[in-house]
Amino acid sequence: MAREDSVKCLRCLLYALNLLFWLMSISVLAVSAWMRDYLNNVLTLTAETRVEEAVILTYFPVVHPVMIAVCCFLIIVGMLGYCGTVKRNLLLLAWYFGSLLVIFCVELACGVWTYEQELMVPVQWSDMVTLKARMTNYGLPRYRWLTHAWNFFQREFKCCGVVYFTDWLEMTEMDWPPDSCCVREFPGCSKQAHQEDLSDLYQEGCGKKMYSFLRGTKQLQVLRFLGISIGVTQILAMILTITLLWALYYDRREPGTDQMMSLKNDNSQHLSCPSVELLKPSLSRIFEHTSMANSFNTHFEMEEL
């Protein structure tokens, strides 16, 4: 009974862990898909600069095809573990354990590789100034993708220019910054702000924002936390799976052992009952002789008196 309760507890824990696998894997895929589009605009601005290499080494492992494939495979493995737990199938649970072990090794290798790569390309503040070279083609029909990337970055990071908003006046033939530099954006807002109130423009340059971006965003921290959580959950799932495999295998062997023990007990009972019946006459004779001896001794003592 206690063993059966333990098996039920292990199965419930595996159900919960598989649910966590699904939720965390879907979360990683969703955030990675969002960051993939986000990074496309950042890489457009940093193309052919030292900053581009740093961005790739910092964020590429997050959206790496291997990482995406691991999360997709983990969802399938979670379904495999769920089916094996429901049906108490030793083969499915063994496949589940092996798959988790392989996925964990791949994730560990990716984590070590990412850590080593991040240490290889240090980025200095002076590297951010090189982004000014990407401003000269802003607004040209041939470089609409670059214009879109600059507008996207300035809106998202609430910045203007590289060092200051005057970079647009220095590096281009524009008389005022783009409208994406406005705190409250509307058509012609930058011209109005440049002529009336400069405080309506973002005062901080995008170089500092890019430098902070390379140090890690909240989304990157969330993904790293999810990656560590998935790894820890995998270790717990592997331990519980091994324990459940052992318990189910022991339960399948136990009924045969109990049957053999019951047969031995039945045989001993069958053997003991006839022997007791055979010993009953002998015991009765011994009891009669003992009673006669006691009565003779009592009679002899009475005659002496």
From Swiss-Prot:
Component of a complex, at least composed of TSPAN12, FZD4 and norrin (NDP). Interacts (when palmitoylated) with ADAM10. Interacts with MMP14/MT1-MMP. This is Tetraspanin-12. The chain crosses the membrane at residues 13-33, 60-80, 90-110, 225-245. It comes from Homo sapiens. It is a multi-pass membrane protein. A lipid is attached at residues 9, 12, 83 (S-palmitoyl cysteine). Residues 1-12, 81-89, 246-305 are cytoplasmic. Belongs to the tetraspanin (TM4SF) family. Changing residue 12 to S: Impairs interaction with ADAM10. It is found in: Cell membrane. GO terms for cellular component: membrane; plasma membrane.
